[in-house]
Design a protein with these regions (language model features):
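A Zn2+-metalloprotease active-site environment signal
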Residues: 2-273
Length: 273
């Protein structure tokens, strides 16, 4: 904990409560340690995480996915990966997309290139443009290291100690032990907006109709009752606000048809109508 914060806390407590010098020093020290644990360490871990090699990110993501024990549909996974490959996205990451046959309405990205899509979400989709929007959004979480940064911030001091001593094996073990928590991680509004707008730009560059990006989330929100909220909606707040700025950014677009993407999507919908 920075010395100036502890000293500041010491002076504040002395003035407020008139405690003895030793008592104030102990309180200031404890307070400083708590502030450091909850604020400084998570922030530092997130910054250091930005320099983790991509090969180590892959190890991390693979370990978390293995710990989740999700069984992927090989045919569906191959089709999803072929769909993403057809977007011709240039990236240093090897993107691997797994389709899990589960009613959960969700998708999430893991460090190093792993993206997981549940069939419950695929069944809600009406067009290839919606799938393109979803995968573009999740890809940005990988490309911008949102998943890695959020994991480091969530695990705080445990991750920081591993990073400090260069113990990647320890980091992988810690992350795998928190796999279920990691699957449910929510990103900050700033990171979600970055994924929205950067993912949207991928669609615009390929002249894929981007309006369906906002429509998908709006429709999911409207279709579900208050008792059954899709996980992808509950973990992505401010859906109406996001739909509005996505539609604004996509205004004036002149999309073209993409028969290859449409064909792959049709094959997926035959598996999961």
């Amino acid at each position: 904990m920075p010395l100036f914060l502890s000293l500041g806390l010491y002076m504040y407590m002395k003035k407020l409560f008139g405690l003895s010098r030793n008592a104030l020093l102990i309180l200031a020290l404890v307070g400083g340690l708590l502030l450091g644990y909850f604020f400084v360490l998570p922030f530092t871990a997130e910054q250091v995480a930005s320099v983790i090699p991509r090969s180590s990110e892959k190890l991390l993501g693979d370990a978390v996915y293995a710990a989740l024990q999700e069984e992927g549909d090989s045919n569906g996974s191959a089709l999803l990966t072929a769909f993403f490959d057809s977007l011709n996205v240039v990236t240093p990451y090897s993107i691997r997309i797994t389709l899990v046959d589960d009613k959960t309405v969700n998708a999430f990205a893991l460090p190093g290139g792993q993206i997981v899509v549940y069939s419950g979400l695929l069944k809600k989709m009406k067009s290839y443009t919606e799938l393109a929007a979803l995968l573009s959004h999740e890809f940005i979480h990988v490309e911008k290291r949102h998943a890695t940064r959020s994991i480091c911030r969530s695990l705080g001091s445990q991750f920081f100690v591993g990073l400090l001593f260069g113990n990647m094996g320890s980091l992988v073990s810690v992350a795998a032990g928190h796999a279920n928590e990691i699957r449910s991680l929510s990103y900050s509004r700033q990171l979600e907006k970055e994924a929205d707008l950067s993912g949207l730009q991928l669609l615009l560059d390929r002249r894929i109709d981007a309006r369906d990006f906002a429509d998908l989330f709006t429709r999911l929100k409207e279709q579900e009752s208050d008792l059954v909220i899709p996980e992808i909606i509950s973990s992505h707040p401010d859906t109406d606000v996001r739909a509005a700025y996505i539609k604004k950014a996509a205004a004036g677009q002149q999309p073209v048809s993409h028969p290859v993407l449409n064909h792959i999507f049709d094959q997926l919908k035959k598996l999961y109508p």
